[in-house]
Amino acid sequence: MLDLKLLRDRPEEVRQALNKRGAVADLDRILELDGKRRQLETRRVALQAESNSLGKKVGELIRQGADPQGAEVTALRQQGADLKAEIAQLEQRERELEEEMQTLLLTLPNLPLPSVPVGQDETENVEVRRWGDALKPTHPVLPHDEVAEKLGLLEVGRAVKVAQSRFVAMVGAGAALERALIAMMLERHIAAGYTEVIPPFLVNSAALEGTGQLPKFAAESFRCADDDLWLIPTAEVPLTNLYREEVIPAERLPLYFCAYTPCFRREAGSYGRDTKGLIRLHQFQKVELVKVTHPTQSEAEHEKLVQDAEAILQMLELPYRVVELCTGDLGFSAARCFDLEVWFPSQNRYREISSCSNCWDFQARRANLRYKEAGQKGTHFVHTLNGSGLAVGRALAALLENHQQPDGSIRIPQALRPFLSSRFLSEDGALRTAP
């Protein structure tokens, strides 16, 4: 959520920043509601003071011997009752204005940092660096979905029978390979200082509102009809909300969390795109990284977050590039974001496998997540960061293509081998599909 004081003090600056994102926002209405609410608050406080004064006056008169049922005391009590009724009306109207204002504020995306490149869409993102050789192979490379089915790593038709389209079932060596990837990712991140969490896979509406998925992206999520619970679209939601409505001692910052979870997305706007394979599914596996930091640390922690995600791609020997997202391509909650895009030889292009975002205090304001400096009064909002470390299905898909050998076998990268059962690993380091 944006700082309301910033909107009051520098509305044009906020308007220009939102325009860079291509966001449509009724700032004038928000400021109008805020102004009316503050006027009512001023009036209510004055009436409350008057009511308190009347109460004291009545008490004083009675102590001085006035008749409690007399005309003077009765008139003052009636005046006090009228004031209380007016105060109650003002409080009700204040709540209505506050509710409408908060509803509008929740629809506003985060403001991009001044350093973010200005652009309209992904075509204007800026490449930062590359790693590995993204070369067109000298031998034919099957798309990952074809080689996976050929090797018996996944079941598509039977998964669709159990659920619907955009679901798959990993089986045999495919399941073992996915499990090995998850274990490798978690072990690397734990070694880098992250605390592993197994969070709830169902969260309430307040949690989704805290990280910015609600109200804007309700149509993208799966909801349990009889409960205020949603299947998580990413572990970012439960991890970031672990400390919601709490005050963290500043000396405990930064906090690092990692989690493996299944993730669930309706993909309502992706009809006809990536209909085969592991790229775009309703249910997919992901290892997520979340940081809760002091504001002075967040930019440095953002760069470390990107490096932590990059480390997995390097361990898997997968060519990739780092891209900074332009203003028009930023996620709703992000103030700055770097995407990691892994190379897919069959498509002759890079595809996103991780988004590493610095949300500044945007999510913290929505979740009321604060810190307190020792020996100082007051609290301040933390900064939150998140990134995929990595999307497991896409990592597996990229591995099947980039390490596909001329004979059709799949070479398992050295760093992954200790996590894969020897039943599925041949002596020359290739994936064995029939142990």
UniProtKB/Swiss-Prot annotation:
Q: Which residues bind ATP?
A: R265, R266, E267, E352, I353, S354, S355
Q: Which GO terms describe its molecular function?
A: ATP binding; serine-tRNA ligase activity
According to UniProt, this protein's pathway is: Aminoacyl-tRNA biosynthesis; selenocysteinyl-tRNA(Sec) biosynthesis; L-seryl-tRNA(Sec) from L-serine and tRNA(Sec): step 1/1
Catalytic EC class: ligase
Q: Where in the cell is it found?
A: Cytoplasm
| E.C. number | 6.1.1.11
Q: Which UniProt keywords apply?
A: Aminoacyl-tRNA synthetase, ATP-binding, Cytoplasm, Ligase, Nucleotide-binding, Protein biosynthesis
Q: Reaction catalysed?
A: tRNA(Ser) + L-serine + ATP = L-seryl-tRNA(Ser) + AMP + diphosphate + H(+); tRNA(Sec) + L-serine + ATP = L-seryl-tRNA(Sec) + AMP + diphosphate + H(+)
Pfam (any one)? Seryl_tRNA_N
Q: Which GO terms describe its cellular component?
A: cytoplasm
Top-rank taxon of the source lineage equals Bacteria
List the Gene3D superfamilies hit by this protein, alphabetically.
Bira Bifunctional Protein, Domain 2, Serine-tRNA synthetase, tRNA binding domain
The annotated subunit structure for this chain is: Homodimer. The tRNA molecule binds across the dimer.
Job description of the protein? Catalyzes the attachment of serine to tRNA(Ser). Is also able to aminoacylate tRNA(Sec) with serine, to form the misacylated tRNA L-seryl-tRNA(Sec), which will be further converted into selenocysteinyl-tRNA(Sec).
What's the protein here called?
Serine--tRNA ligase
Q: Which gene is the coding source of this polypeptide chain?
A: serS
